[in-house]
Amino acid sequence: MDNVQPKIKHRPFCFSVKGHVKMLRLALTVTSMTFFIIAQAPEPYIVITGFEVTVILFFILLYVLRLDRLMKWLFWPLLDIINSLVTTVFMLIVSVLALIPETTTLTVGGGVFALVTAVCCLADGALIYRKLLFNPSGPYQKKPVHEKKEVL
């Protein structure tokens, strides 16, 4: 008798929770960068947020085009988690530095959006980490060989 496995229907990245969090993260970072540009904030604020926008766009394109499935020689979820944590640290620093002097309203707005971006990046990293931990097809999958056999 044939043991046919049902095909798992692929859910597009844009409709997944991970996709929604990445899109929200991109929107918040672009908004923060726009506020910093309009307010003529110090250049490091604009450069850091601009760099984060390009990195987030890279990861979104990577997942939308499913290039992570083609390039298996890199462990993309680990890179994504590291990126989320580094982005969290940088955006926290930018937001604190933008909020302390309270120079203009737009700079404060950019700082607030950078702070919300940092929280969103932390949530993104936690979401990816949770998916890695509970991935049933990962290397730590429990196999029937490891189960105890009952002796009667």
Swiss-Prot record:
Q: Which UniProt keywords apply?
A: Chemotaxis, Cytokine, Membrane, Secreted, Transmembrane, Transmembrane helix
Q: In which tissues is it expressed?
A: Isoform 1, isoform 2, isoform 3 and isoform 4 have highest expression levels in adult spleen, lung, testis, ovary, peripheral blood leukocyte, placenta, pancreas, and in fetal brain, skeletal muscle, thymus and heart. Lower expression levels in adult skeletal muscle, liver, thymus colon, prostate and fetal spleen and liver.
Q: GO molecular function terms here?
A: chemokine activity
Residue span(s) of domain MARVEL = 13-133
Which is a GO BP term held by this UniProt record?
Answer: neutrophil chemotaxis
One Gene Ontology CC term in the entry: extracellular space
State the signal peptide span.
none
Q: Which sequence ranges are marked TM in the entry? A: 45-65, 81-101, 108-128
Q: What does this protein do?
A: May play an important role in inflammation and regeneration of skeletal muscle. Essential for embryonic development.
Q: What is this protein called?
A: Chemokine-like factor
**Which species is the source of this protein?**
Homo sapiens (Human)
Q: What is the lineage of its organism?
A: Eukaryota, Metazoa, Chordata, Craniata, Vertebrata
Gene coding for it: CKLF
